[in-house]
Regions:
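Sec-dependent signal peptide recognition
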Residues: 2-8
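C-terminal motif of bacterial Sec signal peptides marking the signal peptidase cleavage site
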Residues: 14-15
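Short, contiguous pre-domain boundary segments
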Residues: 24-36, 140, 181
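Short, conserved catalytic-motif segment at the N-terminal edge
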Residues: 35-97, 118, 137-141, 286, ...
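Active-site SXXK
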Residues: 48-51, 71, 96-129, 133-134, ...
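Short, surface-exposed loop or secondary-structure junction motifs
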Residues: 135-375
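Low-complexity, glycine/alanine/valine/leucine- and proline-rich hydrophobic stretches
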Residues: 369-395
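Short, well-ordered beta-strand elements
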Residues: 390-392, 397-407
Length: 426
């Protein structure tokens, strides 16, 4: 009997180990912040003051927040105007241009196929795309001609996901490649496959894995999703990510009735906000057009802030949310490991995994990074979109933090916003 009791106690403790704790499968929206969250309700007012001040001063047209700890949403507020000119107030379910937030979705889609055994992370890209170059740029001449040499090592899928491939890494060469790949006989390409096969024929800016440079490699990842799955990127992403997670308002294309929910984008010119309503997330493709064949993989998605919060919570949960598993825990852990050489072009001690920027683990490595707040936990993941939609996933604190506005250029409000969130933690 005594032995049985001891065994029961052991089983009890094993069953309650941190690794086996349940992950929140839905968001909870309490009327007041629970004390168990250890969040100062009074200090959350700093968030409101910051964002309202930026709106009142005309620095940003609007701001939308979504902050949750352990699945409990403790700040989800809308500030400002969806459209300043008409006086239309921002709503929590408005649609935003996500731009490069598309990249993480594409990366996850590709990694679901990795889990299915379709490829190894260090497989050469040329194994699946024979058109892929094996040349590195040596010299680009003023007339557009260039000389090359053979790569020191093959371009791999790991390099694509970590933005260390060298594709489009030279700005002048990237312009040449972009101009060519976006146009065929003076009209845009009809499919992602056509576009990517044109892009990968250009020489690389550096040997794969030797540098970091933000580039259109995510489009290549998107084509590989189509190659391995046998389905259009849009269909596969809906099937494996958007629908399982309940991201019902996220897409590349929409029926016309959704237009009224899309916030107006703004540019800052001479100190004033100027409406640019016809700015689209992607390479000029109207999300309300009839031709929906082309879906860019590095940009192009639109959606609500809660939809993307669902994606972030899935990552935080180790691959599962809404009762559906998208990726395995070990795959998420692999994606969260730095892949870059140091130093690199990303900045002092810049770290990037397989789809996400990573806050360095060592405090000494973080002090020289100007665009990082020192408040954020080491190991956190983040990225965002060109029109200032940002997200952060903090496993240590159990936090997901999102701030959306559709305004360029950057106002640095993201870093200030992060400070106001973290200072409220008790």
């Amino acid at each position: 009997m005594k032995a049985l009791t001891i065994i029961s106690i052991i089983v009890l403790f094993v069953g309650c180990s941190p690794m086996e704790q349940p992950k929140p499968q839905n968001f909870d929206y309490p009327a007041t912040v629970p004390q168990t969250l250890k969040i100062s309700s009074d200090r959350l007012a700093y968030i409101d003051q910051l964002l309202q001040d930026y709106v009142d001063k005309g620095i940003i047209p609007h701001a939308l927040t979504f902050v949750a700890k352990n699945g409990v949403v403790f700040h989800n507020k809308a500030f400002g105007w969806s459209d300043i000119e008409s006086g239309k107030a921002l709503e929590k379910d408005d649609l935003f241009r996500n731009y490069s937030q598309t990249k993480a979705v594409t990366s996850v889609a590709l990694m679901t196929l990795f889990e299915q055994g379709k490829f190894q992370i260090d497989d050469p890209v040329s194994k699946f795309i024979p058109e892929c170059t094996d040349q590195v740029l040596e010299k680009l001449n003023p007339d557009g001609t260039y000389t090359t040499r053979r790569v020191a090592s093959p371009l791999t899928i790991r390099h694509l996901l970590s933005h260390s491939s060298g594709i489009g890494g030279n700005r002048d060469l990237q312009t040449l490649a972009r101009n060519h790949m976006r146009q065929r006989d003076n009209k845009p390409y009809d499919t992602l496959a056509e576009e990517v096969k044109a892009l990968v024929q250009y020489p690389l800016a550096f040997d794969p894995g030797t540098e970091w440079n933000y580039h259109p490699a995510s489009d290549v990842c998107g084509y590989l999703v189509e190659y391995f799955s046998g389905k259009p990127l849009r269909d596969y992403v809906k099937e494996t990510i958007l629908t399982p997670l309940g991201m019902i308002d996220t897409d590349w294309y929409y029926p016309e009735k959704y237009r009224e929910r899309l916030v107006t984008a703004y540019n800052e010119r001479d100190g004033k906000l100027v409406a640019t309503p016809d700015v689209w997330s992607g390479v000029g493709r109207n999300p309300f057009q009839n031709d929906t064949r082309y879906c860019q993989a590095g940009t192009g998605l639109y959606g609500t802030i809660e939809d993307y919060a669902r994606f972030c919570q899935m990552i935080l949960n180790g691959g599962v949310f809404n009762g559906n598993r998208v990726l395995g825990r070990r795959t998420i852990e692999m994606m969260s490991v730095d892949q870059l050489p140091h130093p690199n072009n990303g900045g002092p001690d810049f770290h990037f995994g397989l789809g996400f920027e990573i806050y360095p683990e060592k405090e000494t490595e973080r002090k020289g990074i100007s665009n990082f707040t020192q408040m954020v936990s080491p190991g956190s993941l983040q990225w965002g979109g060109m029109y200032n939609t940002d997200y952060l996933i903090d496993p240590k604190e159990g936090l997901i933090i999102l701030l959306y506005t559709n305004r360029i250029p950057d106002t640095k409000i993201w870093e200030l916003f992060l400070n106001t969130v973290y200072q409220a933690l008790q």
